């Protein structure tokens, strides 16, 4: 678990537990939300069908979500990523791939790349997630078709009686179930669109927010990050932009970044992560210093189409889970903190970021500091699943980071943004989910959450599929199951 705040003993115990059934800890990423519950590992579909019929359960992938959406106390946890549902089959006629519930993003990308020369339309950059878990919680990249679930053309799940139910794009319930954040589960197979592997022109820049539109010209995809303790009127940004590339261009080695600041600036940016991690109170003066340096740097490369996370990393070769080189020391801070994210209309993103900068800076006297950066990934166009971030308009994902003990401050910042921007939509694996999101998810005049619950009731009349406390609050479906503390205290 990247950046986990577990003790060595807890880490070792969790490592030993992998692949075993019985009492196990289910933890959110960074271990803010957790519970101990009964775990089962389905080795095949028949075993999963039997388990579904035995009693109340929830489904867990790689447990990469930060907000505890995968943590459901008092029920059997189906550990799908550790199971044996490993279907992987490519159909050259339709250029689609069939994927089982135990397949990781890495396994799928390697399968498509090697011998087939294909890739996903888009993805996040964490390779160990289960594909189905990533899609179910709205995982996204940036640029065209950014939300992974938008590439689903068919899905199969088991209902409350263990029977197969298959939905295809265009079926009445499909658009609700394709991205349903654990309320329709277990999804045992997906069929996804793919595309040919291709290089991109990748430009990484360090500049100012006022230059964003100019720097993005000609880009098909843009991911930018703001240093929150630089000038609040015109903060320092790092931009990663992708543009289409002539197919005949060969991938190039990394050039030296160009721009002002000299060797000291280069060294400082490279080692920023270490300062940020061990001296959190020093974050603001460090960023003020960077602001004073007024760095302007850029690099341009052609990406290697064989790179597993080609939408993120411009360095040729199999490099993963990392940012473009001139900003790597800054983005590395995101691997050791709590991450909360939500979506706002793309044209509102600069104003939202400036608002967060001001609100966060006002909390310094209470000991709160944002960690490293505010990340913004742009999702142009619209997506098919009704709960996709950009289901109705282009959106931008706002990612905030803080030390794990400060996660509640991030939830406060989210709520403040929602006061002023009613179209704020949730990231189902990172947002502080709650009733406040109902209006935005139903803003087209239809009660999509009610429709989702109708689908749930129809296929799970037994009520054996359970979902997390925060999802229940957002759906307004009653109190959550009692955890040990509530039960022992007599509160539930």
Describe the role of every protein-language-model region.
Residues 345, 353-400:
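C-terminal structural cap/anchor segments
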Residues 326-328, 408-492:
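Activity-critical C-terminal alpha-helical subdomain
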Residues 136, 153-351, 355-358, 370:
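C-terminal substrate-binding/cap subdomain adjacent to the FAD-binding core in PCMH-type
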Residues 1-27, 485-492:
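Intrinsically disordered, low-structural-confidence terminal and linker regions
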Residues 61, 222-227, 322, 339-340, ...:
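A short glycine-rich, hydrophobically flanked beta-strand micro-motif that places a catalytic Asp/Glu
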Residues 67-87, 141-162, 186-193:
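Structural signature of FAD isoalloxazine-binding scaffolds in flavoprotein oxidoreductases
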Residues 116-125, 163-167, 199-200, 221-223, ...:
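Short secondary-structure capping/junction motifs at helix and strand boundaries
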Residues 27-122, 134, 138-142:
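Glycine-rich N-terminal segment of FAD-binding domains in flavoprotein oxidoreductases
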């Amino acid at each position: 678990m990247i950046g986990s705040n577990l003790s060595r003993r807890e880490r070792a115990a969790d490592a030993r537990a992998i692949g075993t059934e019985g009492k196990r800890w289910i933890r959110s990423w960074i271990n803010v939300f957790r519970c101990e519950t009964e775990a089962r590992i389905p080795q095949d579909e028949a075993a999963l069908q039997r388990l579904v019929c035995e009693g109340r359960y929830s489904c867990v992938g790689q447990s990469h979500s930060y907000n505890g959406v995968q943590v459901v106390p008092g029920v059997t946890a189906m550990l799908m990523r550790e199971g044996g549902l490993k279907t992987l089959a490519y159909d050259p006629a339709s250029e689609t791939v069939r994927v089982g519930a135990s397949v990781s993003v890495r396994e799928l990308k390697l399968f498509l790349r090697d011998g087939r020369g294909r890739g996903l339309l888009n993805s996040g950059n964490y390779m160990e997630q289960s594909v189905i878990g990533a899609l179910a919680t709205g995982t996204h990249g940036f640029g065209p078709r950014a939300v992974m679930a938008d590439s689903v053309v068919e899905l199969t799940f088991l209902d409350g009686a263990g029977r197969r139910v298959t939905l295809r794009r265009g079926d009445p319930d499909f658009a609700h179930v394709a991205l349903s954040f654990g309320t329709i589960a277990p999804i045992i197979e997906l069929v996804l669109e793919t595309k040919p592997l291709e290089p991109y022109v990748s430009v990484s820049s360090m500049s100012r927010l006022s230059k964003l539109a100019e720097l993005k010209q000609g880009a098909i995809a843009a991911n930018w990050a703001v240093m929150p303790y630089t000038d609040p009127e015109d903060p320092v940004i790092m931009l990663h932009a992708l543009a289409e590339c002539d197919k005949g261009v060969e991938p190039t080695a990394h050039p030296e970044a160009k721009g002002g600041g000299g060797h000291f600036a280069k060294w400082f940016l490279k080692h920023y992560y270490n300062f940020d991690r061990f001296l959190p109170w020093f974050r603001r003066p460090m960023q003020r210093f960077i602001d004073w340096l007024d760095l302007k740097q850029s690099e341009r490369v052609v990406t290697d189409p064989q790179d597993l996370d080609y939408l993120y990393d411009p360095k040729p070769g199999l490099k993963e889970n990392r940012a473009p080189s001139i900003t790597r020391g800054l983005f590395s801070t995101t691997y050791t903190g709590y991450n909360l994210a939500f979506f706002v209309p793309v044209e509102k993103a600069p104003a939202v970021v400036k608002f967060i900068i001001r609100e966060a800076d006002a909390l310094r006297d209470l000991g709160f500091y944002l960690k490293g950066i505010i990340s913004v990934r742009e999702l142009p166009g619209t997506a098919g699943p009704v709960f996709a971030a950009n289901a109705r308009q282009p959106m931008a994902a706002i990612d905030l980071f803080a030390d794990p003990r400060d996660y509640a401050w991030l939830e406060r910042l989210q709520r403040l943004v929602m006061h002023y921007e009613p179209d704020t939509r949730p990231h189902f694996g990172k947002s502080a989910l709650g009733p406040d999101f109902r209006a935005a998810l139903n803003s087209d005049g239809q009660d999509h959450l009610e429709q989702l619950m109708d689908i749930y009731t129809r296929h799970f009349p037994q009520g054996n599929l359970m979902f997390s406390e925060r999802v229940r609050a957002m759906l307004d479906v009653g109190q959550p199951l009692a955890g040990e503390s509530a039960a022992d205290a007599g509160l539930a």
